[in-house]
Each structure stands twice: as structure tokens, then as C-alpha cells.
Amino acid sequence: TMAYQNYDVTVGGGAPGTTGGDQNGSNSVFDTITSAGGGGGKGSDGAGGSGGGGSRDSSPGGVGNSPPVSPPQGSNGGTGIFAAPQYGGGGGGGAGGNGSNGNSSSGGPGGPGTSNSITGSAVTRGGGGGGGTFAGPSGGNGGPGGGGGQSTAGTANTGAGGGASV
């Protein structure tokens, strides 16, 4: 039961896709509860941030739930692959499961979100973003729960990841 009073709420910003170092999204805070921001994906080389997908250069996805907390927050991102013709990047991890690896023909799909009924009916939120491709339009689909496909933002107010761009 919650007391009738003012509560501090901070809505964290999303993580960017990046070609440089790991750049995670900022944390969200409700009173004394903090939820870690999602991990950024990679553009050309290197691992993604916490839960972000890996690049096309056979780089691993970021590790979810980092730093580790209980209950866990987020899942691992998929691994990218350096293989023609598409050089698929890994999908981002979702709240309910890991992102999938990329392959030679497409980016990996994002991991699934999780369902809850906080609004009175079951809604799935927190899907991972789809992995992009280097040489074509065959990006991975966003994970169930609002994850965006290639070059598409995650669905607003779902905590979902956006898809990587080409």
C-alpha cells in the first residue's frame, strides 16, 4: 500500500546506437526504486553496452543485469557476425530474454519483454531492439514488448529498445 504523498520520479533517457565506447541509457527512479538504463548498441566494432546488441564485426552483445541486482534487470544482447552479404548485428536484450545473434543474411531479433497488469490489463513491455545490418535492409525485428525494428524507435512508454540503423 502506498501512502498519499509526493514521490520523486525520474524517467531515464534511452541509450544511443554508437560507434565509440559503451553508452548506456540513464536510470529511471521512483522514490527509492532505481531501474538501470538500457545498453547502447555498436555501430562498427565492439560489444554493446549492458544488454545492447553487438556490432557486425563478430562482437559480443552487452551483458544484461549490469551491475548485478536482484531481481535481475535486463538480459544479454546478441552477438554480431562478420559474414557477407548482410553482416548482421546482434539484437538487444529484452526485459524477459536475451537478444538473438545476427547472421549473414539479417540482424538478430531483439529479446522479448515481460508482461504485467499494472494498468488493469496485461501489457508486454521492455522488448529489445532489433540488430541492424551493414550491407542491406534486412535488420532484425524488435522483441515483443515494443522493441523497434531496424532504424525504428521503440514504442513510447514501454521501456523498449530501438532498432539499430544501417
How should each PLM-predicted stretch be described?
Residues 1-166:
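Low-complexity, glycine/proline-biased repetitive segments and flexible coils/loops
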